[in-house]
């Protein structure tokens, strides 16, 4: 039976000093010997998805102590990708994931905590905490802050649902008046919570449910709704139970690596493909699998993408459906229920709240359950009142959406598409793969070819788009924005939003070794690997080169002869120290970012750090 980790610091004469310090934090004689549970919070006033978390750590802590544990809360950082977007602040977003993972590991291991409750929400925080949890492999429960309510605005006599991306697109569209832009800006993000579409934050919070590490509703219950409080209360009790099962009953089935197994990663990726989640989830699942020593790769994602249909389309793939609508239709459990019926996921896997996923679905899938309380839970609706306060409203839909033929969530027979919402492309431009969110690509441009318009930075591409220098049929290539080349692998939400605003969203393609926001749609191909800074072919593309994209056949190809390619490689090598570096780009790169770049790996490996690279 494994000993409680915390007894390293709470037991024995030689730990008198440590016990003295524990007493100074409020511990009493009777607390020594109880499981010490770390509450990893991520409150910050910088991020709407985290602005309401300040008191929620202590809410969980009280429940932990009521269940017989000792709770100790700490905070980690959180970057708002939307605020960091469109300038050099975005260089820090992806590297912050590693810092979050490290900070959780540091705090938990330094103080020998026995288990963790991870209070996350936005883009890099959930992945960072997930990476840490799989590194540490001690009992964990995830509970996120929840999604924001969708915005509503009255334009031209009609009420329109909207989100952050609408504000970006409208601001760049010369045809939209100043008054309408102001109205959209003021209405796009009305409440606390993670942005209301199926962007990266909400995608990842849904995937923690599929991995088995979070409670039902974690990915879809609104941040503002009173019912979300129950998740925090239950998490506090559940984590003490999981800790006791492991340390007192020698039940290793409750550990993260037992729950988030290879098969669970298949379930999570299957969910992601079926709901057209953010392409960033590919990076984050690969990174989490790496930390858990699970051999889950791009090849597995490619395999799954070829057999999983699209059962749910949410903004940005469609304009008028947001995560609050997914919740009304039964949330993640309803999508998993349809996938399980079709034999597309593993139902026999353990989850933190039930012996198996299949047993959980019997209670939580709206089409199976007889529980009135579950139905009531999924009737939780937006309150329609701007607020930064958690659990501040209790609105209800009159009924849930269980229409699986024409509703927000479909069954396999009525799928939006038989092909999945994400695809892995290969070819000479992406020998190790590239990712495209097919759920956001118009059917008319699934096969596309055109001349390359080459840019050495996101900023240069934005400047060209806004100056009307991009024409229908162009293929924008934005390079040296990968994990090492950026460094930090910036998101390209502004270029794709500006293409939309110029009426080019269905007339152009964008290819990059950087990545895309979960808010991106259109023919946007990211994570091109190997990246330009690693000697990838994307670094040799020249203005006017013909590029072919064939999503149905998973192909990304630069039309170039072997002779011409060899000549370009020779010319690049002759640049010496200037080889595989962006020409004419002025960008100040801090020591912190240089350290990340020195260890960063390819997007095909999740852009995780590899310390061994420092010694080659």
Swiss-Prot record:
Q: How is the cofactor bound?
A: Binds 1 [2Fe-2S] cluster per subunit. This cluster acts as a Lewis acid cofactor.
Which pathway does it serve? Amino-acid biosynthesis; L-isoleucine biosynthesis; L-isoleucine from 2-oxobutanoate: step 3/4; Amino-acid biosynthesis; L-valine biosynthesis; L-valine from pyruvate: step 3/4
GO terms for biological process, alphabetical = isoleucine biosynthetic process; L-valine biosynthetic process
Please tell me whether the keyword Disulfide bond is annotated for this protein.
no
Catalytic residues (positions): 517 (proton acceptor)
Q: Give the protein family.
A: Belongs to the IlvD/Edd family.
Assembly and binders: Homodimer.
Please give the name of this protein: Dihydroxy-acid dehydratase
Naturally occurring in which organism (per UniProt): Methylocella silvestris (strain DSM 15510 / CIP 108128 / LMG 27833 / NCIMB 13906 / BL2)
């Amino acid at each position: 039976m494994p000993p409680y980790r915390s007894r390293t610091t709470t037991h024995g004469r030689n730990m008198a000093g440590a016990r003295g310090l524990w007493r100074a934090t409020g511990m009493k004689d009777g607390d020594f010997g109880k499981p010490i549970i770390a509450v990893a919070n991520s409150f910050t006033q910088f991020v709407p998805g985290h602005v309401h978390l300040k008191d929620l750590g202590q809410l969980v802590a009280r429940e932990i102590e009521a269940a017989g544990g000792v709770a100790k809360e700490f905070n980690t950082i959180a970057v708002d990708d939307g605020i960091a977007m469109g300038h050099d602040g975005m260089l820090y977003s992806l590297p912050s994931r590693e810092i979050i993972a490290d900070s959780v590991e540091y705090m938990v291991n330094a103080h020998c905590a026995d288990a963790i409750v991870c209070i996350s929400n936005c883009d890099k925080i959930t992945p960072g905490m997930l990476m840490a949890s799989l590194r540490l492999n001690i009992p964990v429960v995830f509970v996120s802050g929840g999604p924001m309510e969708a915005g509503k605005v009255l334009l031209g006599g009609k009420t329109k649902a909207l989100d952050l991306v609408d504000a970006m697109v409208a601001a760049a569209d010369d045809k939209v008046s100043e008054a309408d832009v102001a109205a959209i800006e003021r209405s796009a993000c009305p409440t606390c919570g993670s942005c209301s579409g199926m962007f990266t934050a909400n995608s990842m919070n849904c995937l923690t449910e599929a991995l088995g590490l979070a409670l039902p509703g974690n990915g879809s219950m609104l941040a503002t709704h009173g019912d979300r409080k129950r998740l925090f209360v239950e998490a506090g009790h559940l984590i003490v139970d999981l800790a006791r099962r492991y340390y007192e009953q020698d039940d290793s089935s409750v550990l993260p690596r037992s729950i988030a197994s290879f098969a669970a990663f298949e379930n999570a990726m299957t969910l992601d493909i079926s709901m057209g989640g953010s392409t960033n989830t590919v990076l984050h699942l690969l990174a989490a699998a790496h930390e858990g020593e699970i051999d889950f790769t791009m090849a597995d994602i490619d395999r799954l993408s070829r057999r999983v249909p699209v059962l749910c389309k949410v903004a940005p793939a469609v304009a008028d459906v947001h995560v609050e609508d997914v919740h009304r239709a039964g949330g993640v459990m309803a999508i998993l229920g349809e996938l399980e019926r079709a034999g597309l996921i593993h139902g026999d896997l353990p989850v933190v709240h039930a012996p198996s996923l299949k047993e959980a679905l019997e209670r939580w899938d709206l089409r199976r359950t007889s529980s009135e309380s579950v139905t009531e839970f999924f009737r939780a609706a937006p309150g329609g009142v701007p607020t930064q306060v958690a659990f501040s409203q209790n609105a209800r839909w009159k009924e849930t959406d269980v229409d699986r033929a024409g509703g927000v969530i479909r069954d396999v027979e009525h799928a939006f598409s038989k092909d999945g919402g994400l695809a892995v492309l290969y070819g000479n431009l992406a020998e190790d793969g590239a990712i495209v969110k097919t759920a956001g690509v118009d059917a008319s441009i699934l096969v596309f070819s055109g001349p390359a318009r080459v840019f050495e930075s996101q900023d240069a591409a934005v400047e060209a788009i806004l100056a009307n220098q991009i024409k229908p049929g162009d293929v924008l290539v934005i390079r040296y924005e990968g994990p090492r080349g950026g460094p930090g692998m910036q998101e390209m939400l502004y270029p794709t939003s500006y293409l939309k605003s110029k009426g080019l969203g269905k007339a152009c393609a964008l290819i990059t070794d950087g990545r895309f926001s979960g808010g991106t749609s259109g023919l946007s191909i990211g994570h091109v690997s190997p990246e330009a800074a690693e000697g990838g072919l994307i670094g040799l593309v020249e203005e006017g080169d013909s590029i072919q994209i064939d999503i149905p056949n998973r192909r990304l190809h630069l039309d170039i002869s072997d002779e011409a390619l060899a000549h370009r490689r020779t010319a690049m090598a002759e640049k010496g120290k200037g080889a595989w570096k962006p020409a004419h780009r002025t960008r100040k790169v801090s020591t912190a970012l240089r350290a990340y770049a020195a260890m960063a790996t390819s997007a095909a490996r999740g852009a995780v750090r590899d310390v061994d690279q420092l010694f080659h």
